[in-house]
């Protein structure tokens, strides 16, 4: 991937598949959503093939790999099954995320510092496919340093605590944590992305942070698309990010 000065938007289409799986139908099609997102200005498409297959299915990933004009960011747990699948699909980008069956979504970042040997082996193996491997972590210096040590070229900072913050003081504290994490990551020579819980009313403060390469956003886009359409939802988010990151 070429890393430009402008901030990129990665559109996560998982929850289009969530709606489909709720009834076991063939619609709505996440592949169509991905193509619409690209037309509306998405710089990449993110999908998370979960162990429990609650939304995205293998077939979606295979189809997307064939039709995307931008690039795929493939989110996956650190399991043998997923690593073998990623080796077969060979996405441009792979993001390793923590995963349990009970979670509603990816809660908290990957504990890289607590399992360095395991993560290092996964990063090395997946990097051999030609993918740029990133690690979904909290904006914590210990985890950022560990990410560099295991050889990951990129990290994605977890913005969920910022998104969930209730009071102005909490919001400011969590935003500062992200700002500091971005600066520390860049200083470590890492490509720094961010995402989780971002929506139309909280994205601008994060998009204004210098040093972030890409924001990954999904649930808010899919929710807004119910009322304005998918292309309009993506275009609106892209405009907010472009304006805030100038």
Curated annotation (Swiss-Prot):
Active site: 48, 75, 196
GO cellular component terms attached to this protein's record: cytosol
EC number(s) recorded for this UniProt protein: 2.6.99.2
InterPro entries membership: Aldolase_TIM, PyrdxlP_synth_PdxJ, Pyridoxine-5'_phos_synth
Residues reported in the UniProt entry to bind 1-deoxy-D-xylulose 5-phosphate: 14-15, 50, 55, 105
UniProt xrefs under Pfam families: PdxJ
Swiss-Prot/TrEMBL site (Transition state stabilizer) positions: 156
UniProt-annotated location(s): Cytoplasm
Database matches in PANTHER family: PYRIDOXINE 5'-PHOSPHATE SYNTHASE
The family this protein is said to belong to: Belongs to the PNP synthase family.
Subunit structure: Homooctamer; tetramer of dimers.
Classification via HAMAP family: PdxJ (MF_00279)
Record function comment: Catalyzes the complicated ring closure reaction between the two acyclic compounds 1-deoxy-D-xylulose-5-phosphate (DXP) and 3-amino-2-oxopropyl phosphate (1-amino-acetone-3-phosphate or AAP) to form pyridoxine 5'-phosphate (PNP) and inorganic phosphate.
Stated name of the protein: Pyridoxine 5'-phosphate synthase
Gene this protein is translated from: pdxJ
């Amino acid at each position: 991937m070429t890393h430009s000065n402008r901030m990129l938007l990665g559109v996560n289409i998982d929850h289009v598949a969530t709606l489909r799986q709720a009834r076991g139908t063939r619609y709505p099609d996440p592949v169509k959503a991905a193509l619409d997102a690209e037309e509306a200005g998405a710089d990449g498409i993110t999908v998370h093939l979960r162990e429990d297959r609650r939304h995205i299915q293998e077939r979606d990933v295979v189809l997307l790999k064939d039709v995307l004009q931008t690039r795929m960011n493939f989110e996956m747990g650190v399991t043998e099954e997923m690593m073998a699948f990623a080796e077969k699909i060979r996405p441009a980008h792979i993001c390793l995320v923590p995963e349990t069956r009970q979670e509603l979504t990816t809660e908290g970042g990957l504990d890289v510092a607590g399992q360095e040997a395991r993560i290092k082996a996964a990063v090395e193996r997946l990097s051999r496919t030609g993918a740029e491997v990133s690690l979904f972590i909290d904006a914590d210096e210990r985890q950022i340093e560990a990410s560099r040590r295991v050889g990951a070229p990129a990290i994605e900072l977890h913005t969920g605590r910022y998104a969930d913050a209730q009071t102005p003081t909490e919001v400011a504290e969590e935003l500062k944590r992200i700002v500091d994490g971005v600066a520390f990551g860049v200083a470590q020579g890492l490509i720094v992305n961010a995402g989780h819980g971002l929506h139309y009313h909280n994205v601008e403060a994060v998009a204004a942070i210098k040093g972030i390469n890409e924001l990954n956003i999904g649930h808010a886009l899919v929710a807004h698309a119910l009322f304005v359409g998918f292309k309009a939802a993506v275009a609106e988010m892209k405009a907010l990010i472009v304006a805030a990151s100038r």
